[in-house]
Design a protein with these regions (language model features):
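Short linear Ser/Thr-Pro motifs
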Residues: 11, 104-106, 146
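ATP-dependent small-molecule kinase catalytic core of the GHMP/sugar-kinase superfamily
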Residues: 2-4, 9, 16-22, 27-30, ...
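Anion-binding (especially nucleotide phosphate/pyrophosphate-binding) glycine-rich loop
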Residues: 38-136
Length: 196
């Protein structure tokens, strides 16, 4: 059994500048400052005793052919990794999984890719996970989103992330123990019950 744990994130500045149309057209590109939270998306991948695919999330699906899955992120992650039969996949979130503004869909995608690659015996870099998640969400599924969520989920930590026509650059921000302590004491995340 493979278990993946992927963080969600908050942004301190630069939201919207990670969208390709902005980042590639501005002379300096886009930039966000992102902080991975201690809230996660958990993904498990386990071998089944038959060739069916079973996916458990807020719903449950069991199919003979992965192409018949309604969960498009799971379906496309399976297609990209080549793990297409004989598996049981479960996703569990520490937070509501849609509309929170914390990048949870991208964390699901990164977590799925990480778990499926490892299930297939491959270790991939954080950069590859982020790029593959972008390919699924933006290129294949046509989501009108930027790239910060995938990179924040794949790299974790506190980062300055730059986006431009030539790609993405991640710069980890080194925070003092005092600053980390203060952030933990002063930042409060509240679920209002509303989705965006």
């Amino acid at each position: 059994m493979i278990i993946s744990r992927t963080p969600v994130r908050v942004s301190f500045c630069g939201g919207g500048t990670d969208v390709d149309s902005f980042a590639s057209s501005e002379p300096n590109g886009g930039m966000v400052t992102s902080l991975a939270l201690n809230r996660h998306i958990h993904v498990t991948v386990n071998r089944r005793f038959d060739d069916k695919v079973r996916v458990s999330y807020s719903s449950m699906e069991t199919v003979d052919d992965f192409e018949d899955l309604n969960h498009e992120l799971v379906r496309e992650a399976m297609r990209l990794t080549g793990v297409t039969s004989g598996v049981e996949i479960t996703t569990i979130a520490d937070i509501p999984s849609r509309g929170t503004g914390l990048g949870s869909s991208s964390a699901v995608t990164v977590g799925l890719l990480n778990a499926l690659h490892r299930f297939a015996g491959r270790e991939v870099s954080a950069e590859q996970l982020a790029e593959e998640a972008c390919r699924i969400e933006i290129d294949v599924l046509g989501q009108p989103i930027g790239r910060q969520d995938q990179y924040a989920a794949a790299f974790g930590g506190v980062n300055s992330i730059r986006f431009g026509a030539d790609g993405v650059d991640i710069e980890p921000l080194r925070l003092s123990a005092y600053t980390v302590k203060r952030l933990g004491e002063e930042l409060t995340l509240v679920f209002t019950g509303l989705s965006r």
